[in-house]
Amino acid sequence: DQYDYPELTANFEDATYDWANMPYQIDKNSPQEQIEAVALLGYHAGVSVEMMYDDDGTGSGAFSVDVPYALYNHFDYASCNFKPRTVSSQVWDSYIMEALEMRRPIFYAGTSKEGGGHAFVCDGYDENGLFHYNYGWSGSGDGYFASTAIDYPNDVGAIFDIMPKEVHKNTSEAPKHFEVVPAENNALSAKLSWK
């Protein structure tokens, strides 16, 4: 027998998220207010990308390309883009490093060799240049890996520019018409100017 599940909805406009009660990790022994705070955000995140919940665990039916729209329209984040990996590993790794240096977590997605897809988070790096991937699943499989050695190496894509609208609005643009003029006497100095 198949059960017809009701359509899931959320009132994003009136939602208030209790960020103070969202620790890095929770479990069944966590205080109820923490469980409820994390559950509400997780539920709204799923609804925002039209995730399909089922009792057989075969997948979510959600698409990573829907995440930027959800972040912008439902969670007050600045416009961002899902970027498929179409560049060399060196360039891709530089994108990762830049985002992490700016303290921005990276939404990551890919498919396994068997074809199953998964979305996860890249949230750090170590002194060896390996990146920390959080796959979910209560920490199972998390660890530091080269970007080419992750569990979902095919059809890789990521969102590097995730930030709240308020932060984006207050972030200055890079200088335009930037010019570097070396000092005349071969000194180790330069004059920087921009308009």
Q: Where in this protein do the model-derived segments appear?
A:
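Cysteine-nucleophile protease catalytic domains, especially the papain-like/related folds used
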Residues: D1-P84
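Active-site-adjacent substructure of cysteine-protease-like catalytic cores
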Residues: Y72-N134
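Cys-His-centered catalytic/binding microenvironment captured across papain-like cysteine peptidases
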Residues: E101, E114-G116, Y125-S172
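Pro/Thr/Ser/Gly-rich low-complexity, intrinsically disordered linker/stalk tracts
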Residues: K165-W194
